[in-house]
Amino acid sequence: STQAKTLFPYTTLFRSKNPHYWDTDGKRHDPKEWSPLHESGKVISYLKNDGNVRDTKKPFFIMVGMNPPHSPYRSLNDCEEQDFNLYKDQPLDSLLIRPNVDLKMKKAESARYYFASVTGVDRAFGQILTTLKELGLDKNTVVIFASDHGETMCSQRTDDPKNSPYSESMNIPFLVRFPGKIQPRVDDLLLSAPDIMPTVLGLCGLGDSIPAEVQGRNFAPLFFDEKAEIVRPTGALYIQNVDGDKDENGLVQTYFPSSRGIKTAQYTLALYIDRDTKQLKKSLLFDDVKDPYQLHNLPLEENKEIVAQLCGEMGAMLKEINDPWYTEKILSDRIPY
């Protein structure tokens, strides 16, 4: 990949469902092993500097994108047998224990493969951490473990693992380890995707180098000191886009901004619009404190003050990023832009 080679001096591109990948020079390799183990092996090789691929006197940045756990979770092609054996005899109701789960869904049969994939990823990622320690790099390396989305896994009676404001889909891990600099704790910071890059730069001591046009914020001071004087966000945006216009060949050319919402410390709100009229067609409103499993969708008209406050915060955030809902003034009767 010419683009990948331009962005990164050492690159491995891999398709986890197919047993092949391409290296920096575009050469194809067929590892014939489960992708997370292959990827952790490539990271370990890079850290050990096999083949003299990096300058050991300079800092390094590694991004590892492991595909599992990822649907369909149907067979041992999606996980390692040793991991599946840990779960194969477990009753489904001992694995899927959330009260909003529907065990009658066909997807429930995937649970054992799903948890096997999670276990395998844990082991593969652990191998990287072990290597950092063996090489004496663990004390001066910022390690971040995150995900792009969650997995509903039969919660809310939906087959879709993502693309929703439900907690199982929207809440993801963001674990940061920096020995001696960050004290272990759990923080309720509402970190959003645009904040990740500037925060990572801040963690690396490069806060002064963050470009002015970056929309996200650097929350590194909060990681170093939970009492740091910095304004915490009161909410995080939920954005759902679907396919828009297509050309004569059926290829998607634009997207349709189907839903916008906001998640705060207490509430989750999502508004969905009709494709033709762009008027409200569905809403989701949950009190995540009183109803943590989001079992009761609250009517908007019976919670006007709460909805007005949430829409006000959401409108300001959409305006800040020049979102299509703001530029087209979608649902302006509810959202004060």
What is the meaning of each model-derived region?
Residues 149-155, 182, 194-197, 202-288, ...:
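C-terminal cap/loop subdomain of S1 sulfatases and analogous C-terminal strand-loop tails that border
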Residues 43, 61-64, 174-175, 200, ...:
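A short aromatic-rich beta-strand->coil structural motif
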Residues 298-337:
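Long, internal low-complexity/basic segments
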Residues 5, 37-51, 126:
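Amphipathic, non-transmembrane alpha-helical secondary structure
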Residues 30-36:
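Outer-membrane beta-barrel proteins
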Residues 2-13:
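Short, small-residue-biased leader/transition segments that mark boundaries at the very start
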Residues 15-29, 47-193, 202-213, 275-279, ...:
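Active-site-proximal cap/lid insertion segments
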Residues 44-48, 115, 122-129, 133, ...:
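Non-transmembrane alpha-helical segments in soluble domains
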